[in-house]
C-alpha cells in the first residue's frame, strides 16, 4: 500500500542539540479474540497458503523486500530497505524465543505457463508477553494488491494466534498508511496508542 503523506514524519530539535531528529508517527492497534471466532480467510482462485517451515525463510525474506522496497515503510525502516536487511529481520523473527509459527504464513499464487509458483505475500507472528501476540510485517507484493489478500493474511495470522492460545493481539502501522489502518479496523482492531518512533530506532 503506497502512501506519501508527509505528516508521517516529524522533525524535532532541542536547544542543547541542534541536530534534527526524524520521527515517524505510528499507531498501535489491538484486538481481543476471546470474545469471538475469527472468520476463515477466503483466497481467490489460484492462491494458497504455505505454513511456516525453516526452509521457507529465504522466500519470506525475498517477498518481504518486494512488498516494502518502494513503500514509505521501506524508506523509514532500515531493516526493510534492502534484501539483506529483510533476510536479517527474518532470521531475528524466526529465531526469537517467542516466535509463533502458527501465525506465520507465506501466500503463493500458482502462476501460468513458465511463471510457476509466485510468492506474493507474507506475515509473521511473535508472542512477546503471556497470552498476547504481535503481528509482524503484513505485506502483499504490488502486482497482487486489491484482491483481499491482505485481509486474508491477517485473518490467517489471527486464527494461528488463537490456535496457540493467544487472544490479545496487537500490531503497529505507520499512521499515514490509511488503507492499512482502515483494513485493520474493519477486522475489529482498535487504535490504543500513538507512538513516535525515531527513524534510527525503526
Q: Predicted regions: what is each one?
A:
Residues 1-53, 198:
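Acyl-donor-binding surface of acyltransferase catalytic domains
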Residues 1-6, 161-172:
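Conserved GNAT acetyl-CoA-binding A-motif
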Residues 78-116:
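Active-site rim helix/loop that mediates acceptor-substrate recognition in acyltransferases
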Residues 137-140, 146-163, 181-186:
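Conserved acetyl-CoA-binding loop-helix of GNAT-fold acetyltransferases
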Amino acid at each position: 500500500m503506497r502512501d506519501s503523506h508527509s505528516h508521517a514524519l516529524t522533525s524535532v530539535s532541542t536547544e542543547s542539540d541542534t541536530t534534527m531528529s526524524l520521527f515517524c508517527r505510528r499507531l498501535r492497534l489491538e484486538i481481543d479474540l476471546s470474545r469471538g471466532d475469527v472468520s476463515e480467510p477466503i483466497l481467490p482462485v489460484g492462491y494458497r497458503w504455505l505454513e511456516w517451515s525453516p526452509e521457507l525463510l529465504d522466500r519470506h525474506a525475498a517477498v518481504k523486500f518486494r512488498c516494502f522496497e518502494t513503500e514509505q515503510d521501506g524508506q523509514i525502516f532500515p531493516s526493510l530497505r534492502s534484501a539483506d536487511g529483510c533476510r536479517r529481520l527474518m532470521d531475528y523473527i524466526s529465531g526469537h524465543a517467542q516466535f509463533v509459527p502458527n501465525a506465520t504464513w507465506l501466500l503463493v499464487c500458482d502462476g501460468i505457463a513458465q511463471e510457476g509458483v509466485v510468492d506474493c505475500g507474507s506475515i509473521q507472528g511473535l508472542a512477546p508477553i503471556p497470552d498476547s501476540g504481535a503481528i509482524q510485517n503484513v505485506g502483499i507484493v504490488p502486482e497482487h494488491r486489491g484482491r483481499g489478500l491482505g485481509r486474508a493474511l491477517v485473518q490467517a495470522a489471527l486464527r494461528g494466534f488463537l490456535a496457540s492460545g493467544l487472544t490479545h493481539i496487537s500490531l503497529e502501522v505507520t499512521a499515514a498508511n490509511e488503507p492499512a489502518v482502515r483494513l485493520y479496523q474493519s477486522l475489529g482492531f482498535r487504535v490504543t496508542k500513538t507512538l513516535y518512533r525515531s527513524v534510527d530506532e525503526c
